[in-house]
A protein has these predicted regions:
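A charged, aromatic-enriched C-terminal amphipathic alpha-helix characteristic of glycosyltransferases
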Residues: 277, 291-324
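Acidic donor-binding segment of Leloir-type glycosyltransferases
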Residues: 373-416, 642-670
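Short aromatic/hydrophobic "clamp" motif used to bind/position activated sugar donors
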Residues: 436, 684-686
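Conserved donor NDP-sugar-binding/catalytic core segment of glycosyltransferases
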Residues: 448-498, 692-726
Length: 772
């Protein structure tokens, strides 16, 4: 049973942050805890933080969170409110230090706007996981013909310095003196003098002035609808509950242009009356609002983003990300694991047949050492088949001496160059085992090599394992030497250095437990194993590789994209006769360049494609739904996607053929219909609605690392990204488990839900201006 996320909410019930936090806890069906010492220690907790609620000073507030984090044993996430900014004046340094300390305690941080995220990035040395979940907005109330607004300019919320009250009062000098100034709210504690100063200024100007004090929720909407000119002139706002409250009351408040306001306009087009960020701009807008009062009301079809339900979905998705996904048992006792969690595989005791495939070329002496080592394996000899795949040697390898100890077969192909990939495929085609264990002819396995290589695969059919290839000088060694070494009667050979890049790769990924899309680089075919079923499903190695190297990276990249689980087995040790290639030659740029050229067209790792070319196999396949688009808006959407260089776009839906015809011979990367097999591309992107991609938007989506990602672009559209990895693994086991592929993707890979503004996605227009 997974414990629900508890919300830690402290402070008076009428405080804006407290009200927001309690509403979100209710919407996500989360328990609320009102004091840190009441939190169950093993329960994930979400903290709604502002320094003003957790201590008398910013330092004291940070101390409270740090103390909680030191005692709490479960995941902590935090929503930060009132993010520090320069306008805090003398308090800025202390508040900055406070928020840094709180961020260090959290696994994930939430803020209410991209503007707030950028403010944090300005003060942070590191780049923590910061998410944006905007403050929710209730559906706007409909305008009633019975309401006749009073001739007043109104500001909502607590009164404190810097919120713009005095500037609004000054800007009203251009209005008739019978237009009053009303503050819907009360002074913040300790700032009653600000209210007194405003009242005195209004009296001096001969302008009506009133303040309501606290207004109960049941009366607030009516009060806001009674005001002629709704204003929010807080010029340092980073997230505003008061603006949202105006909108929910059906009003379209006057707000100064700025980074946060522009962001709100993307999420909720036309919900705000935006004016220039000057007192003069405000004065002009207020005068027009009195002349044209209809512009101060929300349209009847207004649907601001996010609604409370949408915000709750975003939070719920975030909380689910922190929950560990379990493995799923197959009917035959094996398992399918989430992500790359090979550590969740059960212990298997079966000993299925293993086919050891050895590519060979004129290496008789080295082969003799390898075959000798295979006779000493701890895996039952009756469950081992050995296949020597000769890559066109002048003379067939001699294996007669091992016929009594090993079930051994030789298969041959003509000498058409160095074709290790084709040789391995040839050997695999002769395999009768359930598991394929690839081993090079110059790489001598220790006695428990097969056991350590394949045991995980027995329990986990998606696994591709790679052993530990060590390096030694076996020149002059005999078969007898191998026997005395392995049974401990003699010392081992002179050892060469292991490649540091491999050691670091395995250490940094915890033996590939934390594998990502670039971990294919740590899978080497000299010591690689997988199930025969998976190998055949993948189509084996790419036989077009001719020359040394690259075929194992291509295979591992393809396997990972197809949902394979990569695992390094450090106790599966085999000894390569001689140093690593780089150690032996100091590196061979020409050879490595040839390998890179072969790989670039076959794998979609951006690091392999840095020359600005496009390839038939794209990294991203995008499918754009034409519903709701004009030909002009569609080309804007498609063109914005193709800013990502390694992408192809398919358009489908009403008018797709006609739209494509109107574009003429534009960009051969655009096609009509649905793409075919996308399994070798990194991900498929589905785009619905009037969505535009900023310059780096697609790259940012991919860099989340999510295997399934849904992004809301306000209420204008959605973007959904699914990796081929998640799709392929789910399809592989869907029928066996009797579970829909869609549901299995979520069970094995989760589902991230984010907002478009985080990535630079925004809404387009049905008829954008294309003319010049």
């Amino acid at each position: 049973v997974i414990a629900p996320v508890h919300h830690l909410v402290v402070g008076p019930p009428d405080h804006g942050v407290v009200r927001c936090a309690r509403d979100m806890a209710t919407a996500t069906a989360s328990p609320v805890v009102t004091a840190p010492d009441r939190l169950p220690p093993d329960t994930p907790v979400h903290i709604h933080f502002t320094d003003r609620l957790f201590g008398r000073t910013a330092h004291e507030a940070a101390d409270a969170i740090v103390a909680l984090a030191q005692q709490h044993r479960a995941r902590i996430t935090v929503t930060l409110h009132d993010v520090p900014q320069i306008s805090d004046g003398s308090a800025f340094a202390a508040r900055t230090d406070c928020y840094r300390r709180v961020i260090d305690c959290a696994a994930t941080v939430v803020v209410s706007s991209v503007h707030e995220r950028l403010l944090l990035e300005d003060i942070l040395d590191s780049r923590p996981d910061i998410r944006v979940i905007p403050l929710p907005i209730d559906r706007p109330a409909l305008r009633s013909d019975d309401v006749v607004p009073q001739r007043v300019v109104g500001i909502l919320g607590f009164v404190y310095p810097g919120k713009g009250h005095s500037e609004v009062l000054g800007a009203m000098s251009a209005l008739d003196t019978d237009v009053g100034f009303e503050i819907v709210g009360a002074a913040s504690a300790g700032h009653e003098d600000v209210l007194d100063e405003l009242r005195a200024t209004a009296r001096h100007l001969g302008r009506p002035f009133s303040t309501t004090g606290f207004v109960p929720d049941a009366e607030l909407g009516g009060r806001l609808r009674s005001i002629a000119v709704p204003v929010a002139f807080h010029r340092h706002v980073s997230a505003s509950g008061s603006i949202n409250t105006w909108i929910a009351a059906g009003r379209r408040p006057l707000v100064p242009r700025g980074r946060y306001v522009d962001e709100m306009a993307v999420n909720s087009p036309d919900a705000l009356w935006i004016h220039e960020d000057t007192v003069e701009g405000l004065a002009e807008a207020m005068a027009e609002a009195l002349r044209r009062p209809e512009k101060t009301w929300q349209a009847t079809d207004s649907a601001p983003y996010p609604s409370p339900a949408q915000a709750a979905d975003l939070y719920s998705s975030l909380f689910r990300e922190g929950m560990a996904l379990p493995s799923i048992a197959l009917p035959d006792g094996r398992s399918v694991v989430p992500h790359n969690r090979w550590d969740l595989a059960p212990t298997a005791s079966d000993t299925p047949r293993v086919s050891v495939v050895i590519p060979y070329f004129r290496q008789q002496h080295q082969l003799d050492l390898v075959l000798t080592a295979l006779t000493a394996q701890t895996w039952p000899a009756s469950r081992i088949q050995v296949i020597v795949a000769d890559d066109g040697s002048p003379e067939e390898p001699n294996v007669e001496e091992f016929g009594s100890a090993l079930d051994i077969t030789v298969v041959r192909q003509p000498d058409l160059g160095f074709r290790a990939a084709a040789a391995r495929n040839l050997g695999a085609s002769a395999a009768r085992g359930d598991i394929l264990c690839f081993l090079d002819a110059d790489t001598v396995p220790e006695p428990d090599y097969i056991e350590e290589s394949v045991r995980l695969i027995v329990a986990l059919p998606d696994a591709v394992t790679v052993g530990r290839r060590r390096h030694a000088d076996l020149g002059g060694w005999t078969r007898a030497d191998i026997g005395t070494w392995f049974d401990g009667r003699s010392a081992g050979p002179t050892e060469f250095t292991e490649p540091r890049w491999l050691r670091d790769g395995y250490a940094g990924s915890r033996d590939l437990l934390d594998a990502d899309r670039r971990s294919y680089r740590y899978v080497i075919s000299a010591v690689m194993s997988c199930s025969r079923t998976l190998f055949e499903e993948l189509g084996g190695f790419d036989p077009t590789f001719v020359g040394y190297g690259g075929e194992d990276w291509e295979f591992a990249h393809r396997a990972y994209a197809a949902g394979a689980v990569l695992a390094h087995r450090p106790r599966a040790v085999a000894w390569h006769d001689g140093p690593d290639w780089a150690e032996r030659t100091g590196g061979d740029r020409e050879r490595k360049n040839a390998e890179a050229l072969m790989l670039a067209s076959r794998i979609t790792d951006p690091a392999a494609r840095t020359q600005g070319l496009t390839y038939a196999l794209p990294e991203i396949v995008a499918v754009v739904d034409t519903t709701g688009h004009s030909a002009a808006s569609l080309i804007e959407t498609v063109g914005s996607i193709l800013r990502h260089p390694d992408c192809r776009v398919w358009i489908r839906g009403p008018g797709a053929d006609e739209s494509r015809r109107q574009w003429g011979d534009a960009d051969c990367r655009i096609q009509v219909g649905l793409p075919g097999d996308t399994a070798r591309s990194h991900a498929v992107l589905e785009v619905r609605g009037l969505v535009l991609f900023g310059a780096d938007a697609l790259r940012r989506l991919v860099e989340t690392g999510a295997d399934r990602l849904t992004v809301d672009v306000g209420n204008s559209g959605t973007v959904e990204l699914r990796t081929s990895r998640s799709n392929c693994r789910a399809r592989r086991w869907s029928s066996t488990m009797g579970t829909a592929s869609e549901d299995l993707v979520e069970a094995l890979f989760g589902h991230m839900h984010r907002t478009g503004a985080e990535f630079g996605l925004f809404a387009g227009e049905v008829q954008p201006k294309l003319a010049w």
